């Protein structure tokens, strides 16, 4: 591979379960060899590669001979615990063919929610890359509960791209990319090759279809792409079975759907707010508050809150939505849900008299907010 043809220097590659199993109930080792070869070629050409791999539960099912996916959380976590060791062993053996070492990082949302743990994870990633070691990331499904799960490896890979300041995120799936209709039911569906802006019409196109044995569909890939591109990371969604797909993507050949990055990406702290934080509640705002936040860059005051939804403590990240339920911003609350139920719709000057204390006039300060 000619280094001059490469447009990126640090790349995150996400492999979905449907890619790793080729639609079967076990890992497709032959295909994994080819994917490892492509990533090894990038490493040899000077491109740093981070691999975000699904497939732990599928590997566990194969190793233990489970015919069907169990219903209980405990048994799914059992399969993840057994399968993760098999998965990392397989990747370690494959990359060793090319003289490359791997390092495993198992993450949960809690690791990304806490600022110190987030920075520690970033340091670990950078240390591995500095030594020419391929970081292999997966969600820690063996211990994760719904409250601390990222939820799918599409979103986890987007967060990994932010963690390591990647230039490109490649989401490989069983589809060629994003289409203007469902290609499985509409033979006239056309591939969308370039996306500059992600809006509601595009989200509607993505739908909620789930691929194969995994948990992520095109909707989750679109969500991941939006997170990454806001942080200045380009994104490509493509078929994991397209010949040379990883190398073609990095060499800027036409493959899949390409999402351009924002020209003015979010600064580091706001990237963390958008990508690392668990969103635990929702604030419905009036039109005046919406305009102040989106058009004037103001902080959110209690007066503009119409309704509070969810249970959360001070410091939680919340969805800020309009009267129709459309999210337009996300931010860290200085007040708990209990507090906000008492001060919603009230003037900031009344907060101390209503609560007996205050944490400032702003419910969500503009420095702790990301306008979407």
From Swiss-Prot:
CDD domains: AAK_G5K_ProB, PUA_G5K. It comes from the Bacteria. Catalyzes the transfer of a phosphate group to glutamate to form L-glutamate 5-phosphate. Keywords: Amino-acid biosynthesis, ATP-binding, Cytoplasm, Kinase, Nucleotide-binding, Proline biosynthesis, Transferase. It is found in: Cytoplasm. InterPro entries: AceGlu_kinase-like_sf (IPR036393), Asp/Glu/Uridylate_kinase (IPR001048), G5K_ProB (IPR041739), Glu/AcGlu_kinase (IPR001057), Glu_5kinase (IPR011529), Glu_5kinase/COase_Synthase (IPR005715), Glutamate_5-kinase_CS (IPR019797), PUA (IPR002478). ATP binds at residues 14, 173-174, 215-221. Pathway: Amino-acid biosynthesis; L-proline biosynthesis; L-glutamate 5-semialdehyde from L-glutamate: step 1/2. This is Glutamate 5-kinase.
């Amino acid at each position: 591979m000619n280094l001059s043809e490469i447009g990126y220097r640090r790349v995150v590659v996400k492999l979905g379960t449907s890619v790793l199993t080729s639609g079967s109930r076990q890992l497709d080792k032959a295909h994994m060899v080819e994917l490892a070869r492509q990533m090894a070629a990038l490493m040899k050409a000077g491109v740093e590669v981070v691999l975000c791999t699904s497939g732990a539960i599928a590997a566990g099912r194969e190793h233990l001979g489970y015919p069907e996916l169990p219903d209980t959380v405990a048994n799914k976590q059992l399969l993840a615990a057994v399968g993760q060791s098999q998965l990392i062993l397989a990747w370690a053996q494959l990359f060793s063919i090319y003289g490359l070492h791997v390092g495993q990082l198992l993450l949960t949302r809690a690791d990304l929610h806490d600022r110190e743990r987030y920075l520690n994870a970033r340091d670990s990633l950078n240390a591995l890359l500095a030594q020419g070691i391929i970081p292999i990331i997966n969600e820690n499904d063996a211990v994760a509960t719904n409250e601390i799960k990222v939820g799918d490896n599409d979103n986890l890979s987007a967060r990994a791209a932010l963690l390591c300041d990647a230039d490109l995120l490649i989401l490989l799936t069983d589809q060629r990319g994003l289409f203007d209709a469902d290609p499985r039911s509409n033979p006239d569906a056309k591939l969308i090759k370039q996306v500059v802006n992600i809006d509601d019409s595009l989200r509607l196109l993505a739908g909620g279809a789930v691929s194969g044995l995994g948990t992520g569909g095109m909707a989750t890939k679109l969500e991941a792409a939006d997170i990454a591109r806001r942080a200045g990371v380009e994104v490509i969604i493509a078929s994991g079975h397209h010949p040379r797909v990883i190398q073609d993507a990095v060499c800027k050949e036409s493959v899949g759907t390409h999402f351009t990055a924002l020209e003015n990406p979010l600064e580091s702290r706001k990237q963390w707010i958008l990508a690392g934080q668990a969103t635990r509640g929702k604030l419905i705002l009036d039109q005046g508050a919406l305009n102040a936040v989106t058009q004037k860059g103001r902080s959110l005051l209690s007066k503009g809150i119409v309704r509070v939804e969810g249970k959360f403590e001070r410091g939680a990240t919340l969805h800020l939505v309009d009267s129709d339920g459309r999210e337009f911003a996300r931010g860290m609350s200085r007040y708990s849900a209990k507090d906000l139920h008492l001060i919603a719709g009230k003037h900031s000057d009344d907060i101390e008299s209503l609560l007996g204390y205050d944490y400032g006039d702003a419910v969500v300060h503009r420095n702790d907010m990301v306008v979407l």
